């Protein structure tokens, strides 16, 4: 889209796949003005996709496969976090077709698009919060990434600029509901939580001044008819738009 007039955006290109990659999901503008895209698959639901760099008109420039060396690892590139100060990209791992669950994230070299690491989330016995790393956000230090799983765990990734990146679980929003698209505003994390089985629906606000010890500061219950899914702030951060599902 040409969004120079956001009220009347114009389509300048469209695609459902860019051979051999298929099922694009997330888009993020690189420091050079190009667009980075995650493609979940290649030529079928059982294939692993990759990341693709496009120019501002959506034309293919280059790409890199997300297939780990260990081919038993389930990988479907999903969300994108750019870490320009350290030449890194982080992608999460959630299958929109729900053919299986992801338990790993990936770290890439931003300049070359080389896949550097595929890292498994730490598991907590008796819980499933390590399933399906969903959306990540870069923290204020410019190098630490916080991300949540669709299964409502919250994790911190540090050391992306080193040879030994590390993931730490720091919070659990709920046991069974779904945790979708969050917002980070300065040192606050605002998380959507939705349940289709009678659990909590609403927003949870955390003070993440210490990202390894988040403190819940507020919880908004949206009721059984509204399951929050997606959040986006305005430029000033004074207002947040929320979408959701359940009752029409």
Set out the residue ranges of the language-model regions.
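Feature marking well-ordered beta-strand scaffolds used for ligand recognition
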Residues: 1-248
């Amino acid at each position: 889209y040409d969004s120079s007039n956001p009220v009347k955006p114009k389509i300048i290109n469209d695609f459902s796949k860019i051979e051999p990659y298929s099922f694009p999901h997330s888009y993020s503008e690189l420091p050079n003005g190009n667009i980075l895209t995650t493609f979940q698959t290649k030529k079928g639901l059982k294939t692993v996709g990759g990341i693709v760099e496009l120019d501002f008109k959506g034309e293919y420039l280059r790409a890199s496969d997300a297939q780990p060396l260990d081919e038993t690892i389930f990988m479907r590139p999903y969300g994108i976090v750019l870490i320009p100060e350290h030449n890194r990209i982080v992608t999460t791992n959630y299958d929109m077709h729900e053919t299986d669950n992801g338990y790993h994230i990936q770290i890439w070299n931003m300049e070359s698009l080389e896949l550097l690491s595929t890292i498994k989330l730490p598991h907590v016995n008796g819980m499933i919060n390590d399933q399906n790393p969903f959306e990540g956000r870069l923290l204020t230090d410019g190098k630490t990434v916080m991300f949540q799983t669709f299964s409502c765990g919250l994790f911190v990734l540090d050391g992306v600029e080193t040879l030994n990146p590390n993931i730490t679980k720091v919070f659990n929003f709920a046991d069974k509901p779904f945790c979708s698209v969050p917002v980070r505003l300065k040192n606050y994390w605002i998380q959507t939580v939705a349940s289709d089985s009678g659990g909590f629906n609403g927003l949870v606000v955390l003070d993440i001044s210490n990202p390894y010890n988040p403190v819940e500061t507020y919880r908004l219950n949206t009721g059984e008819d509204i399951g929050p899914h997606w959040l986006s702030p305005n430029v000033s951060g004074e207002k947040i738009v929320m979408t959701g599902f359940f009752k029409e």
